[in-house]
């Protein structure tokens, strides 16, 4: 590399280290108070040279006291040289380097550069006068090489002996020894400390460039360029490689932006569907032996309880009056027979005759019939109306009937068989007779005597011959004709340990027929939160079940309604179990309970009560699908011997020839296969990730690692923002104006330990120790060198060509 000559006069560098100039007059120098003007004095003399102003140098081309210097300076009457080539001075601390002298009378400055390509100036570090003994003035040609061994060699003839330089470390910690070394012909120099706080030490010496653990780009442009060049996202590199073509760059930028908008839109739709938690119904078929479910059978003919026979007679009389007034029908027959069976001791009873049947309105050809219910004060009344007169009469009669049953003692129980015979005439399973222990009996106030077939039977094969066969007696003499108009058998199939709610899930079998009930079982598995609202065995349900059975939603709804009625009406409905400490509703104790009950029941039907939300479905339950086929039984040809045979088994004598007094029911499994219906989420976590990956791959060809690259870009951008912001704040802090000192004094005040000796001071020591370099922010530019370049670390030693 050839030296580049400066074409302008430059000021003396302010970071020149104060020290000794060993020469004819043994001079020493220091800075004046402005830190721009040097002052010199002879050792032992108290009179320094005056501070007349900054010393300046002059440019020279080839020759002169410095030979090939780019700029010359005069210090204390001696010419001082600034070299513009990549020469490392002794003692710089920037690596093993050598010192070069141009003559015996010219001190030399060592120069350091950031790189060979950017060597645009020089840095003056330290000057020593005497050259090494092996170098003569006549031997100098101006061309020097740096050999591999680290010592300087000359192209001029003659022997050359290497000499080890002195280093910066010795200058910093042992300034006296360093000055002595320079007197022996070795020069030491040091690069100025890096700008920063005064307490920050200079960077440690390094050999060459070493990559740090974490390195950031210099600017956001460089960061974005690196990302677009190396990212695995498709289309990103087009934003960089097409920079020379603005049309392509703009087009690819718009395409990338459009793809990003489309990706965000589709991801939004995907997450919206996922947050709604949709489910799939997965149906699978399994084949295994199954236990037969329970079957409850009721005769549909409730009995008249003996303690309230008189009350029921009064109710029948009141009902006949209402029907006569509405439809002109005479129902007075049978009153004497009922009066004869009235017991002497009866509970107190009050029949509310204000609640009577009446015509409400005419809607064209349809007549509405109903009754009015009012609260205890009579200020709030409403009509419960029906378009069917039969339904109106039955509901009105049922209301008064339940009001009377509430007067029964809590320990009262009715017999479950009729006096004329048994309800179940025969029972068999798979050709074997049933046992009495396989039946459970109870009395229902509305559906009469009921039997639950509770045999532990496992279905071996499908078909009628492998199921349960029952022959039942159908009683045609109703005890409460206004309460039930049914002539037949009430049947309900339900799971084990479940309460049969006959008013909701039962069906009827008419007399004189054979009904075959085929069962198909479905197992339902529901998902809990967050996909649905279900409970496992009643866990987490706020409602306390009043039935001593397993959890079902219907049992929970009934219990919830009864508890709300006790809280609202101060009494409970008779057809449901009571909570602890409550009593049933009756007009004798609660005159307006009917108004409260029907209001609450209407809210339950319209889902305005909280019972629906309080009673979730079971997460796992068995649902029975029933299909029924009927035929006439017994047939005309077999009726004689069939009825005669059944007469010996308990059929009443007067019913021997009456087909309408019998019914046959077969309960079988339609098939042993059962269906399992399981809910599954539409978007599980793996499916959601798969859908997201498909969309990212469709629009950008990206993967999870591509997303990590984006995350890395965001982290780098955040770190770079903090670094640049910190630099700007530090620059603003150090450039903030300080308080102006006294006139003629410098605003730069080094530390006391680093101040040079005063200009007028005297010392008898012939070799005073040199002070430390003041840690101040000084310009790093001489002949075009930037401040960042002047503080840069060393590069590998290069050869200077002049």
From Swiss-Prot:
Can form an alternative heterotrimeric epithelial sodium channel (ENaC), composed of a delta (SCNN1D), beta (SCNN1B), and gamma (SCNN1G) subunit, where the delta (SCNN1D) subunit replaces the alpha (SCNN1A) subunit. Residues 145-211, 738-777 are annotated as: Disordered. It is found in: Apical cell membrane. This is Epithelial sodium channel subunit delta. Residues 192-205 have a biased composition (Pro residues). It is a multi-pass membrane protein. The keyword Glycoprotein applies. Keywords: Cell membrane, Glycoprotein, Ion channel, Ion transport, Membrane, Sodium, Sodium channel, Sodium transport, Transmembrane, Transmembrane helix, Transport. Originally identified and characterized by its inhibition by the diuretic drug amiloride. It catalyses: Na(+)(in) = Na(+)(out). Residues 1-250, 716-802 are cytoplasmic. It comes from Homo sapiens (Human). Potential alternative pore-forming subunit of the epithelial sodium channel (ENaC), capable of replacing the alpha/SCNN1A subunit, creating a more active channel with distinct properties. ENaC functions in epithelial tissues, where it facilitates the electrodiffusion of sodium ions from the extracellular fluid through the apical membrane of cells, with water following osmotically, regulating sodium balance and fluid homeostasis. This subunit could also function independently as a sodium channel or assemble into other tissue-specific heterotrimeric sodium channels. It holds the Pfam family ASC. Glycans are attached at residues 330, 548. The chain crosses the membrane at residues 251-271, 695-715. Residues 166-176 have a biased composition (Basic residues). GO terms for biological process: cellular response to acidic pH; cellular response to aldosterone; cellular response to vasopressin; intracellular sodium ion homeostasis; regulation of blood pressure; sensory perception of salty taste; sensory perception of sour taste; sodium ion import across plasma membrane.
């Amino acid at each position: 590399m050839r030296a580049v000559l400066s074409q302008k006069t430059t000021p003396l560098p302010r970071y020149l280290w104060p020290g000794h100039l060993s020469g004819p007059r043994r001079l020493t120098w220091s800075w004046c108070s402005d830190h721009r003007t040097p002052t010199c004095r002879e050792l032992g003399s108290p009179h320094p040279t005056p501070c007349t102003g900054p010393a300046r140098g002059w440019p020279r081309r080839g020759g002169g006291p410095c030979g090939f210097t780019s700029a010359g300076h005069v210090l204390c009457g001696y010419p001082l040289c600034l070299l513009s080539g990549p020469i490392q001075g002794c003692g710089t601390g920037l690596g093993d380097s050598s010192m070069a002298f141009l003559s015996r009378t010219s001190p030399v400055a060592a120069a350091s550069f950031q790189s060979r390509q950017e060597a645009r100036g020089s840095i003056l570090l330290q000057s020593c006068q005497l050259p090494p003994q092996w170098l003569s003035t006549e031997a100098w040609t101006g061309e020097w090489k740096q050999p591999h061994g680290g010592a300087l060699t000359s192209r001029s003839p003659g022997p050359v002996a290497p000499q080890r330089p002195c280093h910066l470390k010795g200058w910093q910690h042992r300034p006296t020894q360093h000055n002595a070394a320079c007197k022996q012909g070795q020069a030491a120099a040091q690069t100025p400390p890096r700008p920063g706080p005064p307490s920050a030490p200079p960077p440690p010496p390094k050999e060459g460039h070493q990559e740090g653990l974490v390195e950031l780009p210099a600017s956001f442009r460089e960061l974005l360029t690196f990302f677009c060049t190396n990212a695995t996202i498709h289309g990103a590199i087009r934003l960089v490689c097409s920079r020379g073509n603005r049309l392509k760059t703009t087009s690819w930028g718009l395409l990338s932006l459009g793809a990003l908008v489309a990706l965000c839109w589709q991801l939004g739709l995907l997450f919206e569907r996922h947050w709604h938690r949709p489910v799939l119904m997965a149906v699978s078929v399994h084949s295994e032996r199954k236990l037969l479910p329970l079957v409850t059978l009721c005769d549909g003919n409730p009995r008249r309880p003996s303690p309230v026979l008189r009350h029921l007679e009064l109710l029948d009389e009141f009902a006949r009056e209402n029907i006569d007034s509405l439809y002109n029908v005479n129902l007075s027959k049978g009153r004497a027979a009922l009066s004869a069976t009235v017991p002497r001791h009866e509970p107190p009873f009050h029949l509310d005759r204000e609640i009577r049947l009446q015509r409400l309105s005419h809607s064209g050809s349809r007549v509405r019939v109903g009754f009015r219910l009012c609260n205890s004060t009579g200020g709030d009344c409403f009509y419960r109306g029906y378009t069917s007169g039969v339904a109106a009469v039955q509901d009105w009669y049922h209301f008064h009937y339940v009001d009377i049953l509430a007067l029964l003692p809590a320990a009262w129980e009715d017999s479950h068989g009729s006096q004329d015979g048994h309800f179940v005439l025969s029972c068999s399973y798979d050709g074997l007779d049933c046992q009495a222990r396989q039946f459970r009996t109870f009395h229902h106030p509305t559906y009469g005597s009921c039997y639950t077939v509770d045999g532990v039977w496992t279905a071996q094969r499908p078909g009628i011959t492998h199921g349960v066969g029952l022959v039942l007696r159908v009683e045609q003499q109703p005890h409460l004709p206004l309460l039930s108009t049914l002539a037949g058998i009430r049947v309900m199939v339900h799971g084990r340990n479940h309460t049969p709610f006959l008013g909701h899930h039962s069906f009827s079998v008419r007399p004189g027929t054979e009904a075959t009930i085929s069962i198909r079982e479905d197992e339902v598995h529901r998902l809990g939160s967050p996909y649905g609202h279900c409970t496992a065995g009643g866990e987490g349900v706020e409602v306390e079940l009043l039935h001593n059975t397993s959890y079902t939603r219907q049992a929970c709804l009934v219990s919830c309604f009864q508890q709300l009625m006790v809280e609202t009406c101060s009494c409970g409905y008779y057809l449901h179990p009571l909570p602890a400490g409550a009593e049933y509703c009756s007009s004798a104790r609660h005159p307006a309970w009917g108004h409260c009950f029907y209001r609450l029941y209407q809210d339950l039907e319209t889902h305005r009560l909280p019972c629906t939300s309080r009673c979730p479905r079971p997460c796992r339950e068995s649902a029975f699908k029933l299909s029924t086929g009927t035929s006439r039984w017994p047939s005309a040809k077999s009726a004689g011997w069939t009825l005669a045979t059944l007469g010996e088994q308990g059929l009443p004598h007067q019913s021997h020839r009456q087909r309408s007094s019998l019914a046959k029911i077969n309960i079988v499994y339609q098939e042993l296969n059962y269906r399992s219906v399981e809910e599954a989420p539409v978007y599980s976590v793996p499916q959601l990730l798969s859908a997201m990956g498909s969309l990212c791959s469709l629009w950008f060809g990206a993967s999870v690692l591509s997303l990590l690259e984006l995350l890395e870009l965001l982290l780098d951008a955040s770190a770079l923002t903090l670094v640049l912001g910190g630099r700007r704040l530090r620059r603003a802090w150090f450039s903030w104006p300080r308080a102006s000192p006294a006139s003629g004094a410098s605003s730069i005040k080094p530390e006391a330990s680093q101040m040079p000796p005063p200009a007028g001071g005297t010392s008898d020591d012939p070799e005073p120790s040199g002070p430390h370099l003041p840690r101040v922010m000084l310009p790093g530019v001489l002949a075009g060198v930037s401040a960042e370049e002047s503080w840069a670390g060393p590069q590998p030693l290069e050869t200077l060509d002049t």
